[in-house]
Curated annotation (Swiss-Prot):
GO terms for cellular component: cytosol; nucleus. One of its GO terms (biological process) is regulation of translational fidelity. It comes from Danio rerio (Zebrafish). SMART domains: DnaJ (SM00271), SANT (SM00717). It holds the Pfam family ZUO1-like_ZHD. Component of ribosome-associated complex (RAC). The keyword Cell division does not apply. Signal peptide: none annotated. Transmembrane segments: none annotated. Residues 445-507, 548-603 form the SANT domain. This is DnaJ homolog subfamily C member 2. The gene is dnajc2.
Length: 618
């Protein structure tokens, strides 16, 4: 294809070209032979040339092959053929597993021509009859090496192969010089023909990773059937043959396991001693530290950005607040100025009103009316706004004395009417408030039933059921309904209203209620007069005896009593005497009486709570 003409160049056509003609060409001779091979084998001509080159190279190697004489050949025991070196017997000790089948056949042919019994006999050499002649070893060698399966079995246990694994200390200084030959030597067992090399110190991470991945997943063809102790062909029956096969499989599996452990040990040792692995780990560590540092720096920058944004927001909020405060301050100053101006204007208008009325003698003829009008004028000054004052002053200035007087009296009348309305509204509100308080203090329809006994019972119930009790006021109402002798049924609302009323009472009323309650208590608990009955009177724990203390129980005495009840259980001998000793100032009867009261209070409390709970369930 012609290139594009550049600037200044000229394209010239000299002649025309004839059109292409399609013709059919058939191969003949050696080209026809190559065509058939390519078609039948699906290979190219270059591949055929490579095959021919390989065949030529093998023929050249066969021609150049020099056999090595085995000095121990004539001393070999034909019966111990399994332990002989077959390659050495055929003179291929220096080639071994690399020898081709042509080389093996050529070596066998040379050995037969030289060591055949007939040849030696013709030369006058003494021959051992039968299979005891050393020539049998040559026959066994060609039998093993010419069979691919048997040869592989022998190659697997090649006596010249070095199974040693270098230690980590050996490869620490010269890693590549120590381990490279070992891996190349063991690579002969690989099923895969192509395997990665150990490489150098400059090898990339991918190459090193591929190398160790190959060896950690190493697939070996090495097998140990050549070392079978028993041959199944020698078995006399099927069962014996099966037993021999089982024993051979077990021994082969054990040796295979040991071989794979050896390979794994080799790879682990090399991996741990490989300086490249250490370098890669350090690089990876440095990379992670760098990434971590980058993340920390990024996070730090993000925090700084957030902090900067927050400060900007705070600064903006502060400026806005200052602006608002400044605007509010200015507005307040303006309002203050307006208020001051209004005050001055009102003061001026009030002064003008006073001066106008004073100059007209308050539009009256006698002293009494003058005083009254002075009060009315002051009332107008206090009640009227600026506009009303200005309007009134204009009316007083514009008209004559009679008109001014009429305008003043009209304004006074309007202000007095407004004051009267306000007083009436306030009076109605006070009456409504007093009526509400009276209704609340009365406690509804049952106000007439609150006797001194009910009041004391209410106070007792409020103390018995403190704040926090579930459905407290319903419980208190039930307690009063159970223990009141008035017969009036109380609701929770009645109890709440009465409790609030008692809280609003002044101290004198509370003292009076407490005094009446104490007098009633003293009257009910007065000592029983002596009788003429000489019999032993029964004990009453609710009456005040000669050795009893009628004073109310204090909090400290109550705590001492509760602790004594816990300390001395029911099984204690002379329990109440010991309890009374633990409570100073209280006798045995006082303690027993107090205990009885506490039991009754607890029972009543539980009964009231159960009643409320049952009512709530319904």
């Amino acid at each position: 294809m012609l290139t594009e003409a550049l600037e200044g160049q000229l394209t010239v056509v000299y002649n025309t070209v004839a059109a292409s003609v399609q013709v059919q060409v058939e191969p003949v001779g050696r080209w026809f032979e190559a065509f058939l091979k390519r078609r039948n084998r699906n290979v190219s001509a270059s591949f055929q040339e490579l095959e021919e080159e390989e065949e030529l190279s093998e023929e050249e190697e066969d021609e150049e092959l020099q056999l090595e004489e085995y000095p121990m050949l004539k001393t070999l025991d034909p019966k111990d053929w399994k332990n002989q070196d077959h390659y050495a017997v055929l003179g291929l000790a220096h080639v071994r597993y690399k020898a081709t089948q042509k080389q093996i056949k050529a070596a066998h042919k040379a050995m037969v021509l030289k060591h055949h019994p007939d040849k030696r006999k013709a030369a006058g050499e003494q021959i051992v009859e039968g299979d005891n002649d050393y020539f049998t070893c040559i026959t066994k060698a060609i039998e093993i090496l010419s069979d691919p399966v048997k040869r592989r079995a022998f190659d697997s246990v090649d006596p010249t192969f070095d199974n040693a694994v270098p230690t980590k200390a050996e490869g620490k200084e010269n890693f590549f010089e120590v381990f490279a030959p070992v891996f190349e030597r063991n690579a002969r067992w690989s099923v895969k023909k192509h395997f990665p090399s150990l490489g150098t110190m400059e090898s990339s991470f991918e190459d090193v990773d591929n190398f160790y991945s190959f060896w950690y997943n190493f697939d070996s063809w090495r097998e140990f059937s050549y070392l079978d102790e028993e041959e199944k062909e020698k078995a006399e029956c099927r069962d014996e043959r099966r037993w021999i096969e089982k024993q051979n499989r077990a021994s082969r599996a054990q040796r295979k396991k040991e071989e794979m452990n050896r390979i794994r040990t080799l790879v682990d040792t090399a991996y741990n001693a490989d300086p490249r692995i250490k370098k890669f780990k350090e690089e990876e560590k440095a990379r992670k530290e760098s990434e971590k540092k980058a993340k920390v720096e990024a996070k730090k920058r993000e925090q700084e950005e957030k902090e900067r944004a927050r400060q900007q927001q705070e600064e903006a909020a502060r400026l806005l607040k200052e602006q608002q405060e400044e605007a509010a301050r200015q507005a307040a100053q303006q309002a203050k100025k307006e208020k001051e101006a209004q005050k001055k204007a009102i003061k001026k208008e009030r002064q003008k009103l006073r001066m106008t009325c004073k100059s007209q003698n308050y539009f009256t003829d006698n002293e009494a009316d003058s005083v009254r009008m002075m009060e009315e004028v002051e009332k107008l000054c206090d009640r009227l706004e600026l506009i009303s004052l200005q309007t009134l002053n204009e009316a007083l200035s514009a008209g004559n004395k009679e008109q001014s007087k009429a305008a003043l009296e009209k304004q006074v009348q309007e202000v007095n009417m407004q004051l009267q309305k306000e007083k009436d509204a306030e009076l109605q509100a006070q009456q409504a408030a007093r009526g509400s308080e009276h209704s609340s203090a009365a406690g509804g329809q049952n106000n007439r039933g609150w006797s001194e006994e009910d009041l004391q019972l209410l106070i007792k119930a409020v103390n018995l059921f403190p704040a926090g009790t579930n459905a407290r006021w319903e419980v208190i109402a039930n307690y009063m309904n159970q223990h009141s002798s008035s017969g009036v049924r109380r609701t929770a609302k009645d109890v709440i209203n009465k409790a609030k009323t008692l809280q609003k009472l002044d101290p004198h009323q509370k003292d009076e209620i407490n005094r009446k309650a104490f007098e009633k208590f003293k009257k009910e608990h007065s000592a029983v007069p002596p009788t003429v009955d000489n019999a032993m009177p029964s004990e009453r724990f609710d009456a005040v005896g000669a050795d009893s203390n009628a004073a109310a129980w204090t909090t400290e005495e109550q705590k001492l009593l509760e602790q004594a009840l816990k300390t001395y259980p029911v099984s204690t001998a002379e329990r109440w005497e010991r309890i009374s000793e633990a409570v100073p100032g209280r006798s045995k009867k006082d303690c027993m009486k107090r205990y009885k009261e506490l039991v009754e209070m607890i029972k009543a409390k539980k009964a009231a709570q159960e009643q409320v709970a049952a009512k709530n369930k319904k």
